[in-house]
């Protein structure tokens, strides 16, 4: 089985794949600094909790947007699993062509999202990932990555409100019953959630208009993607595991035999 690791700014999402099937998944907080031993032992423990033994993992692949933890994470896999993981980075085989002047500037997470959206749902496809940042990326019918958009994520926007406005509290991010808030909390929730819905619908329509790809599928992923996709008719698919699936698809293109 393959261990796929999606290293984001908030969490490391881990998926165990048996072929194209996700056998188990779990998360580790990214922000806490850890040693290679801590990563190795933590991964071993969490795998066991999900009925997966260390010896069941014969290879690993990492997709990361957080460079400063990569050394410890890679060494943890080498030391505890005897695996030198594949890293999703510039030059790796993905099956899609990146039609931008500087392909190396496109985040690894965006590439694997694009791979998964195109291979699983076909093109043209607009993939939206509601993570720490909200990203929109377009892939045409031939599998060409055309470009994308990066916007502040809902949590970043929320954090800016309660950190920079003295009287605004930290709140739970959820859809309120009405768009017109009746108090501070519900008015903040309305602004955050409905503001994101409005942004999403506008960008979807604008991308389709500029590209002329009005038949493009819209595929959504990310932690808060379910809230947004449930509130707009412009989204075709919500796939919470899209990024992990993309990492696994990229792994399978490398034709690498497992270490063990």
UniProtKB/Swiss-Prot annotation:
UniProt-listed PANTHER family: TYPE III PANTOTHENATE KINASE (PTHR34265:SF1)
Active site, renumbered: 109 (proton acceptor)
EC number(s) recorded for this UniProt protein: 2.7.1.33
GO terms (BP aspect): coenzyme A biosynthetic process
Described function: Catalyzes the phosphorylation of pantothenate (Pan), the first step in CoA biosynthesis.
Cofactor(s) required, per the database record: NH4(+); K(+)
Associated pathway: Cofactor biosynthesis; coenzyme A biosynthesis; CoA from (R)-pantothenate: step 1/5
InterPro entries found in the cross-reference section: ATPase_NBD, Type_III_PanK
GO molecular function, one term: metal ion binding
Family, as annotated: Belongs to the type III pantothenate kinase family.
Domain of life: Bacteria
Residues bound to substrate: 107-110, 184
A Pfam family hit: Pan_kinase
UniProt protein name: Type III pantothenate kinase
Subunit structure: Homodimer.
Binding site for ATP: 6-13, 132
Top-level taxonomy: Bacteria, Bacillati, Bacillota, Clostridia, Lachnospirales
NCBIfam families the UniProt entry points to: baf (TIGR00671), PRK13318.1-6 (NF009848), PRK13321.1 (NF009855)
Residues reported to bind K(+): 129
């Amino acid at each position: 089985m393959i261990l796929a690791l999606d290293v984001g700014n908030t969490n490391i999402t881990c998926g165990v794949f048996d072929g194209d099937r996700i056998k188990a998944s779990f998360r580790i907080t990214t922000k806490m600094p850890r040693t290679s031993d801590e990563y190795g032992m933590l991964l071993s423990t969490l795998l066991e909790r999900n009925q997966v033994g260390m010896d069941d993992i014969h290879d690993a692949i990492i997709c990361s947007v957080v460079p400063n933890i990569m050394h410890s994470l890679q060494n943890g896999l080498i030391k505890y699993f005897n695996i030198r993981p594949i890293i999703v980075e510039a030059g790796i085989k993905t099956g899609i062509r990146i039609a931008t002047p500087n392909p190396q500037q496109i985040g690894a997470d965006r590439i694997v999202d694009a791979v998964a959206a195109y291979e699983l749902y076909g093109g043209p496809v607009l993939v939206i990932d509601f993570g720490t940042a909200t990203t929109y990326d377009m892939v045409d019918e031939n599998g060409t990555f055309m470009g994308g958009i990066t916007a502040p994520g809902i949590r970043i926007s929320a954090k800016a409100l309660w950190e920079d406005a003295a009287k605004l509290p930290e709140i739970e991010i959820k859809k309120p019953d009405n768009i017109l808030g009746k108090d501070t909390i519900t008015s903040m929730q309305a602004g955050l959630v409905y503001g994101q819905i409005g942004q999403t619908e506008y960008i979807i329509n604008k991308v389709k208009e500029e590209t002329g790809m009005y038949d493009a599928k819209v595929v959504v992923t990310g932690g808060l993607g379910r809230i947004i996709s449930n509130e707009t008719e412009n989204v075709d698919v919500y796939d919470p595991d899209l990024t992990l699936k993309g990492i696994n698809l990229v792994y399978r293109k490398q034709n690498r035999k497992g270490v063990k």
